[in-house]
Each structure stands twice: as structure tokens, then as C-alpha cells.
């Protein structure tokens, strides 16, 4: 359709949703809402099944934190539950994975997890001094630990040079158990960026998405901000 100026003059061809009257719009929205509610109920059922997963006992791993070596059981800081994001790491690189950087930069206030007896932290294969320097460089607010000298990362599916992972743990005394793991698109529901973008008429504007003809589309992830951009965002605040 043609975009229009304030006085109604056509300016250029622009991919846009069709214009309809209010009742037609409300009917289309109601039809979509039925599907959204069904998806929400299915997600509730999946979460219920997740709560019923068994767990596996882990060895007594030792990671490296800002204050030195720390047992995995102590990373919980007294909490019963722990979520770990295994951040990708490329040795010797100034700028690390932009996807991991962007994903973890969303989480600036995690105190709300206290009420749920839980923590959320980052573990990476990078040496702790380099990891903490990178955390500061990009303005990341999460707590970081290193698995560079521990088999923990590899055992959790995030070996040196490997991809990102999300792992969830449960603690009974000093014994830690692994309860859940996901990776790839399984992490999207943990992010607010994708749900926000998916509300937009154009969506993520990526080639794989099912969009109307003429909608802007680019290679997958091409719209993501670079790690350098997150550093600039941090400097601006």
C-alpha cells in the first residue's frame, strides 16, 4: 500500500497491514486471541511437566569467581535453586558472542529471584580475569564465574569453543543436582527482546519467518546489536 503524509498525499509504496474498520479489526484480534490463549495453556502444561522432571546428582565442581575458587554449591549463596547461562567464549577476542552479550545484558535487576529461593548467574570458559574485564566492558550486571579450570562447562554441554546453554540446578545441603537444560531457540522464552519484537507488525524481519509478501526480511540474526554496541550503550548510561 502507499504511505501517506498528514494531508493525505501518497509518498511511497510501503509494506503495511491492510486497513479495515474497527469491527473487522476486533474480530481478527479475537480470532488470534483464541490461539494465544491456547498457546499459553500449553506453555503452562509444559512448565508443569518441567516441574516433574527427575534430576541427576553432580560432582563437587569448583569454579572461579571474582574472589577466587568457589564450589558450585556455594554459587547458590544459600538459595535452593540456581539458573546458569553458559556464555560462549572465544579466547583472545576483545568482543565475545553478540548473542550471548545481548541476551545476558537484558538482566539488570535479578533481586526478584530472592523471593523464589533462586539465583541466575553466568558461567563461561574464559579465564576469570578476562571474563570480569569483558563484563565491565559491555556493562553487564550479572554475576560471572569461570569454568576454565573445571570440567563443569564441558559436562554441562558448553565445552571450550562450544555454544551457549542454560542449565538449572537444585541444591540439598552441599549436594547439587541438575534438573533442566535447554539451548538454541529454547532460550527465547527467557528473553524479553524476542517477545517484544514479535508483537510488531514486521516481527523479527528475518528470512525464515512466515511474513506477508513485501515485508522487510534479512538474514537471521542480522538485526542483532554487536557487542561493541552494548559497550556504547553502557557508556551512555
PLM regions: where:
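Non-globular targeting/processing and membrane-anchoring segments
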Residues: 2-116, 133-136, 143, 150-237
